[in-house]
Amino acid sequence: MPEPGYTVVALAGGSLEPDFRAAGYTAVNKAYLPIKGAPMLERVLRAFRGARSVGRIRVVTQPAAFAAAFGERANALADDVIAPGGGLIDSMLAGFAGLAPDQRVLVSATDLALLTPSSIDVFTARADEVAKDADIGYGFVSRHVHDAKYPHVRHTWVHLHEGVFCGAGISMLRAGSVAQTADLLRRVAALRKSPLRLAMLFSPSTWLRMLTGSARIAELEARADEMSGLRCRGVLCDVPELAVNVDRLADLRMVETLLH
């Protein structure tokens, strides 16, 4: 039986990028970078803990690193700490292990330094509205809303018939869908920073329509359904904090300034 509320799978594996190491940071990975005196991961997990729509929280990270960083606070931040796999999708599979197939899960990056409980609840309300029966609900944010608040934040923008968008750092998945489509997810993850190459994975005609900005959200959803055998929907959620992530040293400096 699914548990009440959304289960969170927060991904905090991997190693620290050279950009941060060159600046003298020694954190295990960017999730553990300090922001205002606390690891960024703590800010993210506290946001999930404060969200009304969230039940259980799982964090996929090295258990020893998590225990060393948080000590007695660890149990308050996460219900389960799970060792990561060899890559993004393997880590997702580890985080989903043992969940009921129909459990609704929020998969989240852990470099969303501006994440708040209310932004999470807005996303889940939107997912409940437009992707209630979906297996996968991909979060995305429109550029005009994002740039109105954070005009200097860089993103990979995708031009569609309905507007210009970037991906959010949170998406919704039904737990049973991950194992069913793991191979496809690996291919998508490898291309996620290159929208046109990702479009070619969908089909040459999709690539052409993406190139000209004429592809529609509904046709991308339909093609994703065909490729995966699942029900895939886009979850447009105009909360820009869901898309502000810390990829580079400049991003870290920016969010430190915003949170000052």
PLM regions and their residue ranges:
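Short catalytic helix/loop segments, enriched in acidic residues and glycine
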Residues: Y25-V44
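Short beta-strand-to-loop acidic/aromatic patch adjacent to the donor-nucleotide binding site
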Residues: D102-A113
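Conserved core of the sugar-phosphate nucleotidyltransferase
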Residues: L115-E226, C237-E241
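Conserved active-site beta-strand element of glycosyltransferases/polysaccharide synthases
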Residues: R233-V235, N245
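Short, conserved phosphate/pyrophosphate- and ester-handling motifs at nucleotide-, phospho-/glycolipid
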Residues: R248
